[in-house]
Amino acid sequence: METVRELTPVLAEPEEAAERVTEVLPGEPIRLIETRDGWAEIRTAYDYPGWIKAGAIGGKPHGEWLENRFPDPVTYARTLLGTSYLWGGMTEAGIDCSGLVHMSFRATGRLVPRDADQQEDAGTPVDEGDARVGDLVTYGDGGSAGHIAFWLGAGRILHSTQRDGTDGVVEETEPPELAGIRRLIFRL
């Protein structure tokens, strides 16, 4: 396994103008598939395929790349209030809804999938009346989450959004199109 030296965008194609698929954080493991013309085809730890600049590969071996700095994911997510929304983003420079969930759990030393639909699949359904702070609220139709947020209780959520004039990480009253609530259960 390889890693990267710094925050590195993962692109859909080996060209500067290509769509950003996600980001790789320093220390996260990546699998190198091939290098070509200064680009490296990789797979991320979350099984995202894509391309990064070959010069970004290096740094310390990934070893223990999960952090354990916060007691719970909501506490970490609140440190990102006001951060701008960025599709595929996972840092203070910009973050999307599933990136917020992913990084918030990572800050507690727990690894969860990267995408909203994968995060939904990893959770156990919970009735709204039984929901606890930190459970995941899913939104979308067609049987798959297109958006995800943290439940705060009393009809409030914390999420990263770019909807109705809101841009970034905010706490707000949940929108009416709630699809479900999920609880992630971790075994020791």
Summary of predicted features, one role per range:
Residues 28, 134-135:
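Structural motif
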Residues 3-32, 85:
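Beta-loop motif signature
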